[in-house]
Amino acid sequence: MKQLALSLIFAFPFVVFGQERNEIIQQRVEFIAEQTESEDIDLTNIFDQLNYYYDRPINLNNTDAEELRSLGLLTDVQISDVFLHIKQFGKFISIYELQSLKYWDLATIQLVLPFVSVDDRFDQMHISFKEAMKNGKFELYTRYQNVRPLKAGYQSVPDSILNTSNSYYHGNDGRYYSRFRYTYRTNISVGLTGEKDSGEEFFKGSQKNGFDFYSAHAFYKGGKYLKSVAVGDYLVQIGQGLNVFSGYAFGKTPDIFTSKRTSNLLRPYTSVDENRFFRGGAAVLGYKNFTWLNFYSQKRIDGAGVADSLSDDLEFITTIDASGLHRTNSEIAKKNQIGERVYGSYLAYQTTRLSVGVAHVQQSYSSPLVKDTVPYNIYAFRGTTAASTSMDYNFVLRNVNFFGEVSYNSTNKSFAQLYGVMAALDPRVSISLIHRNYDKDYYTFYNNGFSEGSNTQNERGTFLGAKVRLNSAWTINTYADYFSFPWMKYLVDAPSKGNEFLFQPVYKPNKVLEIYARYRQQLRQKNSRDNDGTVTAIEDVVQRNYRFNLSYKVSEAITVKSRLEYVSIHRESNAPEDGWVFSQDIVIRPKSSPFDLSLRYALFDTDSYDTRIYTFENNALYVFSAPSYYYQGSRAYILLRYSFLRHCDLWVRYGTYIYADRTSLSSGAEEITGNRKTDLTVQFRVTF
């Protein structure tokens, strides 16, 4: 075995030992930002996972399939390759041995290297208090953000108007964030997070306790029989997300392997999304190949309805508000109006190649949910309680990974089904095939299955993707997705269908240059803008995006990135619209300097908001920016990071928009007078 390791070292001297942590994490986050098309997303939990493994890489000689899956960078076939290698040749002696794995190409190795290691020492099962305090990691973050000029909602008005109108915000324009967290390896995590959104009060009025949102957790992992336990806020992720999958999951991206859900079963919650998490307690027990999860959650969520004169709860609920914003009178009135209780159990049998599990989840609101009786809501969930039972599987047979889940809602007597196959047809060719069928009346509170729509409901579709590595420099990523919606949707007053195609060739001849082009076409059916007021016809809406992206590493310290993107939209009832964005980035990260610098200048010109283009932006650690550029104008920002006193970091980012065709921005309480808008982020971190 040692001879094999040595021969690999000399045979493959060109392997690049990893990319910069920020570059790798940005690539993953950028995929998510593009898919969500949201300007304000919180991906802390995903970032935490990669960030942790960068600081403390996974020991390939002392790991399991679940831990490797949690990276989100490997397929199950590639994970199976690791354990097959150990079975045939023994423990890894050198990290270079990864090149001998059949389904690990150089791109995969370079992507994963910063997060894995080879060591013959094993982590100890027993953790002493002294060891935990000595080698644990403490982190403290504090952050301030604002946007100027002040929006209309921040005008100073008399209390008589402020307390009766929904046009003004009760708090100032600052957005505050603080977070404390202690971690010891992946075994222990204790944290407290607080956040105030812009416009919310702080230590006064409706927020006398300071932050509008608090989140706390205590988490332990590592016992033989008590595998993990969580108290406070946590995430539960089971199977392919048809029954329960709290937190965020990837959707369709150029990386076809992200179409499969990677479930982490039980994790601490560290984000500030005020909805998609559980609050209570959970534990995972293990015996031999069996894993048993039990969890209970009870919390208050936002919503509105008809008040009950005999209790604090609503008589019935008409809307559930997931914005997490409490700035105006109406938003404050919705806060914590609904009681939510979720509990469940999951039993799984797991080996290196096989996993089969069964879950049952019971979910209830404090009052019946009764949505508006508009046609598209006919099959929406109504009532107080929903119960669902699911079965999921994951099986690796040689170079093929079979996976899927079937979930049954006994309340509505409806099903959600997903079946998938990922196969490495050749070390250079991989495919992903997924078929889903979600009944129009299927409903669970925390589903998050692979879908075109925003819910795991009212959808049928088939996704086929491929990744082809032509040679060491060229890679092709492509997919096609055909889908239909058996019933109406919001702004679609008839059953509809659509499709989506993506083709992305990537040229990366070495570690300093990467060029890719992307063509993406989306066809969706929406209500026609031409109607007689009685019957609304639907029409095809075709959007095409063309992108050219270049990244060049000028030196070890300097990277330049250029991007040009063009979008066009065609629909029968409207004239064609289009738009473009050109952005130029410079990133300076000298290894011997305490300073990092990121700069961007962008020009954009689009016909309307419909032709907006979302673009990832660098920001402070744990701040995720994906703003949309639309109308005519320019965008620029500068981000400076300063590391000092060994344990301290300071980030300062200042950005500005200048619009050439606007005299005011947005409307209502969000309106800004003038054609300029600036944003500021200041964040401080101390670790010890």
Model regions: which residues?
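Exposed, low-structure sequence patches enriched in small/polar residues
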Residues: 169-173, 276-278, 333-373, 378-688
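Transmembrane beta-strand segments of Gram-negative outer membrane beta-barrel proteins
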Residues: 127-164, 182, 186-192, 229, ...
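Bacterial Sec-dependent N-terminal signal peptides
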Residues: 1-23, 688
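Outer membrane beta-barrel
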Residues: 209-266, 270-302, 425-444, 593-609
